[in-house]
């Protein structure tokens, strides 16, 4: 018998993927005009007002600024997140959304690998086989015998996936003692402050035509965050996490609608292998807690 909250949770996850895909499309649109660290800053600055309102509405301001917060871990996660988003934005300048998503889907495999040295978890041999198969999918997607996809942008997105995995693992450590509100607030603040400092010397004035994009960036990111929290609140991670891969369908659609780009067979085949490996790991790791805060 299915969990009573599964349908609601799956619907929330699908909505979250739609919101985050639209947000990434906006990041790609901005990446052609502004430096990567500035786009990171704009992502954080645009979302900060909504995050503050949400924290106040939830009456969690005291929790967010508690003296018992694990500040070093929050700082580490903030640095990793800023680097991750800047690299991902840099990659989007030359890659389509579907190509970028195919590479970032390797993150669950990396998270499983990192859980051994950092979280002291035991990974069964069959999981290592799934990881190896998933990495084979990356090779297929990159098709290293050609230069079309094995580019600086692709490498940047792969490094961004590693950063995302690190951020997720650090977030799992923090979430053992702190609520999700602290992760949401300080991750957003890190993007706003860190991105602003690193882009100050190269800051480009915001074009009037791009202000609606920034509003869209804030709204889609915020709604996506609420939806993904709702998804994991009403069901087990193993039931809803596989639906995160529905983002690839949105990426293909957005690529076509806005850039008339279609992923080739290598990207789709590699993506299918990576997704299959990721779903296997997610389904097998049902008891493990998952972090639901996405930048």
Model region roles, listed by residue range:
Residues 36-49, 90-107, 150-163, 207-221, ...:
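Structural signature of hydrophobic alpha-helical transmembrane segments
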Residues 34-83, 163-167, 186-201:
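Transmembrane alpha-helices of multi-pass small-molecule transport proteins
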Residues 126-143, 266-285:
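Hydrophobic transmembrane alpha-helices of multi-pass small-molecule transport proteins
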Residues 101-106, 174-189, 225-256:
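Helix-helix packing/entry segments at the starts of transmembrane helices
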Residues 28, 36-37, 51, 146-206, ...:
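Transmembrane alpha-helical segments that form core, pore/gating elements
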Residues 88-90, 107-129, 249-268:
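C-terminal transmembrane-helix exit sites in multi-pass transporters
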Residues 17-22, 52, 78-86, 108-113, ...:
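Hydrophobic/small/kink-forming positions within alpha-helical transmembrane segments
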Residues 8-16, 62-87, 152-160, 205-223:
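Loop-to-transmembrane-helix transition segments
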